[in-house]
Regions:
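Active-site neighborhoods and metal-handling regions in enzymes and metal-associated proteins
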Residues: 1-258
Length: 258
């Protein structure tokens, strides 16, 4: 999956010659490869993924060479020097002003010896509309989460702690193909279920408790997010009434949003 052409179209629409991509998530969006150090430069006709020796082999195998060239930086060929060379013919070069600190933005201007234009909401605008490939990744991430939950529902029992249930969710998401957690999983039980973003701890699950789980998987950089509440053992009439009331409210909200 490569979004270079979409970015190039947006550059033309904005009257820009190129953009320096420094945010890790947007670097992956632009190149199709996740890096933690380096940069991506997208010009009107070509793009470059600049990385170090730790990632060079994997990057070359992963990116579409017809659209993106992988460039190695090291001590003899520093990152800013390579960026300066690649962007020398770009009169109007933008940078991610919303992702860089003010000091970072000025630092790049000083290192490159030129003024940078603000990219503004370029990537937010592009990423708000998902391609079929992106939607497929999100669906797969959700499938992984649902499969993990299905397994964990057969594991949860009185005597387990919130932390143990969270560990089972994480393990089963990874086992089913997740690249990691969309966010730190939330697992709370009993009185702690009133905490929307409670942190799983050593609280022990009792028979008759509600357990709320909020978790998500990642596939090709795209995340899922799901929340489920289940009763362990049996649910009292009051618990069923509360559960049904919340579900009706949720369904009404979904219907109104369509």
């Amino acid at each position: 999956m490569n979004n270079v052409k979409r970015i190039q179209q947006e550059l033309r629409r904005r009257g820009l010659d190129g953009v320096l991509v420094t945010d890790e998530k947007n670097q992956r969006y632009a190149s199709g490869f996740p890096i933690t150090d380096g940069a991506v430069v997208v010009g009107l006709e070509k793009s470059w993924l600049i990385t170090d020796s730790r990632y060079i082999e994997a990057a070359e195998a992963a990116v579409d060479g017809s659209l993106t060239e992988v460039v190695l930086y090291d001590r003899e060929h520093p990152l800013t020097g390579i960026i300066r060379s690649l962007c020398s013919g770009m009169a109007r070069l933008a940078a991610e002003d919303k992702k860089l600190s003010h000091a970072g933005y000025l630092g790049y201007e000083k290192a490159l010896g030129r003024e940078l234009l603000p990219a503004g909401d370029m990537f937010e605008t592009l990423r708000a509309s998902k391609s079929e490939d992106e939607i497929a990744c999100m669906i797969e991430a959700q499938r992984i989460s649902e499969k993990a939950l299905e397994t964990v529902l057969h594991i949860i029992k009185p005597g387990m702690t919130e932390r143990q249930v969270a560990a089972e969710l994480v393990y089963n998401m990874l086992k089913n193909g997740s690249e990691g957690n969309s966010f730190d999983p939330i697992v709370v039980t009993g009185s702690k279920t009133s905490l929307p973003h409670g942190v799983p701890g050593d609280k022990v699950i009792q028979s008759g408790d509600f357990v709320t789980m909020d978790f998500g998987s990642i596939k090709h950089g795209y995340c899922s997010d799901m929340t489920r509440t289940v009763a362990v053992g049996s649910a009292s009439e009051e618990m069923r009434n509360v559960y049904d009331t919340v579900q009706r409210a949720q369904l009404a909200g979904v219907a109104a949003a369509r």
